[in-house]
């Protein structure tokens, strides 16, 4: 794979088809598609000529699974290029460097994969160690906001060709943060302090004059950022899996777990990880990072796990997930009363969510949520308004 594959017209076409998934209804996407062949030709020519530049990104806040995030999204024309670049260069170059148990944002992997691998490790650890073992669960603070560009680019320099590296460097450069409002002292220390994109968005635009920029942070809405987020701490993965030979280790984006028999050895590994995170500019969330006995309740990717004496696993959906869905049901009901959605639409939304979590051992809470849905929509259904 090379840059020729990136600006290949067929690959740009495929990039558009993937980039439009789920957003075909947007005006910008429809306008781009109305002149699709011409747009692909112009994009291809600009990349070949070296005149291609990204357009200004759109920023907005998104509440995802209870977390408010500042999202940066490229224009559709840039998403097409990035999709082709990621599929034909970035992923093929970086995927061989990743461990198998790094489970986010890649084909044939994802949330279910991360949970299945954790459950497999939990069972194997119980068979090998019994109940006399410990687990470290670790989380990073504002992970994407604090990925340092220079260190990220240094990693990619070893795996990308010169023209690929130059193209990727341009993508990363567009994510730098305007910090003109900082004093000279604050600016000199900004790389060593936790950056929060949500708080940065509250600062008046008049203070962001372009006088000072911070080479840190990647926008969550970009696929290149997602791939880079997986790759950035890969040396920690290699250290734990290869150097230390830890069998029961896994990572999902900024969440990590390690299962070991000896607590002191586990604490020593954690100390080494802290040092490596410090070198990378990654900040560990001390409140969410803990070492506990393997027999207690363990939370991983919003599922609560507990080992049974028989070696089986109890799996319960986290309470916050049910609270969030209850609020969503009430929102669906309000939209239904205003005529924005139909009863069948609300029902399909709920059934889709329910199908994801019915496999877990939370039957009682699911029944209560079923009753909540039926209670809110019963009157309208009985009145024949379900269509």
Model-inferred region functions:
Residues 121, 126-253, 258-272, 292:
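Conserved polymerase palm-domain catalytic core
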Residues 2, 86-148:
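Active-site-proximal segment of RNA-dependent polymerases
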Residues 74, 79, 83, 200-215, ...:
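Right-hand nucleic-acid polymerase module
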Residues 1-42, 383-387:
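Non-catalytic, polymerase-adjacent accessory regions of viral genome-replication enzymes
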Residues 160, 274-282:
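A common structural junction motif
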Residues 55-57, 250-254, 286-287:
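Short Gly/Ser/Thr- and Asp/Glu-enriched loop/turn motifs at secondary-structure junctions
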Residues 68-99, 211-241:
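Conserved pre-motif C helix in the palm subdomain of viral-like polymerases
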